[in-house]
Structure formats: structure tokens, C-alpha cells
Amino acid sequence: TIPFDLPVAPSQLARSPDFLVSQAGIAETAFGQGQLLVTPLQMALVATAVVRDGTIPQPYVVEEIRRPNGSTVERHRPTTWRRAFSDATARALRDLMVWSVEHGYAQGARIEGATVGGKTGTAEVGNQPPHAWFLGFAEHNGRRIVVAVVIEHGGSGAQVALPVGRALLEAALNGA
């Protein structure tokens, strides 16, 4: 369970206990299909671990509380929640996500002057149009930004969610 100020649905690898016993079930889960259920927050934490050498900070909503005169009442102090994977795994995933932006399906996420990594996704939802996903990060001038975008029943992740993710990354890097 993610320690968070708001309720968060738990992720789910499989609804039926025997699904992950089969090689087909494992393969479907590995590429984000099958019975896997995740939220944008959970996926944003995965991308955060990628850019933080495998560690996940405890997520928070409010960074700072100020009085009307501008003085600080309270400021959030970032803490590490857990280690998701090793430094080496984080570097490998980061390199793959950057490669995807430079050469793969996520090329539309390029931002001039920034190092950008991304992963598009198109999640099947029965007989309905698929959910469009984009998970990405950008690094520029010492700033690291992570986004997770899902557009329910939006279609292709590369065509629908990626442009939204790129716009969010660019706005955050530009201080908007």
C-alpha cells in the first residue's frame, strides 16, 4: 500500500490465482496486458524510481503551507519510501526509455535541450476502445520531472497520451 494522504487503489497482478501460473499469463502481464491493474500514481512512482536510481520517495500532495504574508508555516521534507530495484536496473530502464524517445514509439516526446525518456502504452479494455498511456520523464538544468498520463478509452498511447505528457513535461521544465 502506498503511504499517501488520499486513498489509492491497490495494484493487481492477477484477478485469478492461476493466471500467473501459465507462460501466457506471465507474458501478458510483462507487457502490461492480461489481468494487470495499475493507477497513474503507481506508474508515476515506477518512473520516479527509474530517475532516482531505484528509490521511490513517499508521495505527497502539498509541498508548502504559507501565511498570507508569505512566510512558511510548514514545508514537506522529502523522504525515501522504499527501494524498487537496483541502481543497475534503474540505469538500464532509463536508457531504454531514453532510447524510445530518441528512436522508438515515443519520439514525439522529444524536448529540445532536455533528456527525455518515455514509454507509450495502449491498454486493451474488453470490447471498448483501449486506454492510452504515456509514462515519461525529462531532465534539464538539474530538474527532473515525471509524468504518467492515462486517457481512458482514448486509443493509441503514442498518438493520444504522449502529446499530453510531452506538454506537461515541457510546461514543468519551463516553470509553468
Identify the function of each model-found stretch.
Residues 1-153, 157:
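Beta-lactam-recognizing serine transpeptidase/beta-lactamase-like catalytic domain environment
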Residues 70-79, 162-176:
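Short, gly/Ser/Thr-rich active-site loops of penicillin-recognizing serine hydrolases
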